[in-house]
């Protein structure tokens, strides 16, 4: 197994990572496994989750993939039960699922009055359903897994919840207002 970059021993702990098949969260999942945690990999694509679990297990870690829609409470609650039955109670929750939608973006970084007269997509043209999808994914998609897994953590010392955000929360980009606002 590769180096434990977390410099801590998580042996016996169960870590749950949403958005686990994504670029950042797959690295978080590997790091948690290298520190000794059993890792529940949550995401939409079981093929990618299985490949990541196989990679972690090839290094000597313990990982299982679970298909989960973080915007569906019943699904989150069921997956929380499944993880507890298979790996144990959640000690660490990493909320990493998130994203953007092209229908919630503008075409340009800066608004100019002439943009109203041409085909440029401005703030005034943003698609409401695209904006709602981004807010649901980035907010509800953190809320529901937290509700599902935090029940297993309440009253147990040493449990942690990490919510992955974005620098856009601090320095919003004008071209992606829904994403920046939801972070």
Q: Which stretches of residues belong to each language-model region?
A:
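Active-site helix of classical SDR
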Residues: 146, 182
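Conserved glycine-rich cofactor-binding loop
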Residues: 14, 21-23
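Conserved glycine-rich Rossmann-like NAD(P)H-binding loop of the short-chain dehydrogenase/reductase
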Residues: 37-51
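Residue(s) in the substrate-gating loop at a strand-loop-helix junction
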Residues: 166
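Catalytic Tyr-X3-Lys loop
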Residues: 112-143, 162
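The beta1-alpha1 cofactor-binding region of Rossmann-like NAD(H)/NADP(H)-dependent oxidoreductases
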Residues: 46-47, 67-79, 128
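Active-site loop-to-helix junction immediately N-terminal to the catalytic Tyr of the SDR YXXXK motif
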Residues: 172-180
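Conserved NAD(P)H cofactor-binding loop of Rossmann-fold oxidoreductase domains
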Residues: 96-119
């Amino acid at each position: 197994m590769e180096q434990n970059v977390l410099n801590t021993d998580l042996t016996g702990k169960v870590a749950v990572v949403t958005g686990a098949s994504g670029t950042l969260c797959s690295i978080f999942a590997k790091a948690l496994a290298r520190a000794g945690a059993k890792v529940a990999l949550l995401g939409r694509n079981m093929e990618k989750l299985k490949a990541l679990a196989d990679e972690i297990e090839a290094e000597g870690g313990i990982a299982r993939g679970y298909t989960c829609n973080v915007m569906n409470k019943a699904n989150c609650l069921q997956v929380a039960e499944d993880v507890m039955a298979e790996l144990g109670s959640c000690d660490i929750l990493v909320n990493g699922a998130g994203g953007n939608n092209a229908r919630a973006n503008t075409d340009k970084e800066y608004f100019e009055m002439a943009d109203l007269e041409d085909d440029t997509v401005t703030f005034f043209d943003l698609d409401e359903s695209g904006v709602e999808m981004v807010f649901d994914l980035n907010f509800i998609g953190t809320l529901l897994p937290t509700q599902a897994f935090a029940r297993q953590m309440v009253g147990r010392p040493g449990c942690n919840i990490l919510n992955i955000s974005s620098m856009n929360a601090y320095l919003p980009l004008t071209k992606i207002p829904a994403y920046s606002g939801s972070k």
